């Protein structure tokens, strides 16, 4: 009778409401995924730009260190203008690495690295910037202080024999060679991440 009709009507209404809720949830999920995908693409493009600039600077640092090592190797017997010669050749200067990590910091602070479903890519990006930080700390704490001490030593001992300078030159050569190797490794990691990010944009 009427009760049965009302019951069927009520059940029908409930089913329609449930369907409506499910559709709304599906649309909401689709919108969230679309927004995440758009944000991820923006992050990816920004990271690619950062990595491209980083690579150029890393190459510049490699050339600088390679040139310095070559000059040190060619230095021969003491000459009167040896100190001035060192300054003219740029041996008393250093070139520190500078990278663009703004995009990475933003992604890290928002936990947005997880937007990349590729765990290997997440780890590679994190390792790259961690390695960069290590090199920067080494340069700031160790090399810069040693170079400053060397410059001070040279300034105060212009009439000194070159024997006292050989240790510093040896350190400079070793430090420059180490930096060269680190920069080379960073470039390799940079190129690997760049390839993965470009593949990500194709998806």
Where does each model-flagged region fall?
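Long, hydrophobic alpha-helical segments that serve as membrane-spanning/inserting helices
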Residues: 1-8, 29-203
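Hydrophobic membrane-insertion alpha-helices, especially the h-region
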Residues: 11-26
């Amino acid at each position: 009778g009427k009760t049965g009709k009302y019951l069927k009507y009520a059940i029908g209404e409930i089913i329609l409401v449930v369907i409506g809720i499910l559709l709304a949830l599906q649309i909401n999920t689709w919108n969230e995924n679309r927004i995440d995908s758009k944000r991820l693409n923006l992050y990816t493009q920004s990271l690619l730009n950062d990595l491209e600039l980083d690579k150029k600077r890393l190459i510049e640092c490699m050339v600088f260190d390679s040139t310095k090592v070559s000059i040190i190797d060619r230095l021969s017997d003491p000459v009167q203008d040896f100190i001035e010669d060192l300054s003219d050749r740029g041996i008393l200067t250093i070139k520190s690495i500078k990278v663009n990590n703004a995009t990475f910091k933003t992604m890290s602070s928002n936990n947005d690295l997880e937007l990349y479903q590729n765990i290997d890519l997440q780890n590679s990006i994190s390792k790259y910037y961690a390695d960069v930080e290590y090199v920067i700390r080494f340069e700031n704490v160790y090399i810069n202080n040693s170079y400053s001490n060397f410059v001070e030593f040279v300034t105060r001992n212009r009439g000194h024999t070159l024997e006292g300078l050989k240790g510093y030159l040896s350190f400079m050569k070793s430090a420059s060679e180490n930096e060269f190797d680190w920069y080379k490794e960073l470039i390799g990691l940079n190129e690997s991440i760049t390839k993965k990010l470009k593949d990500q944009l194709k998806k």
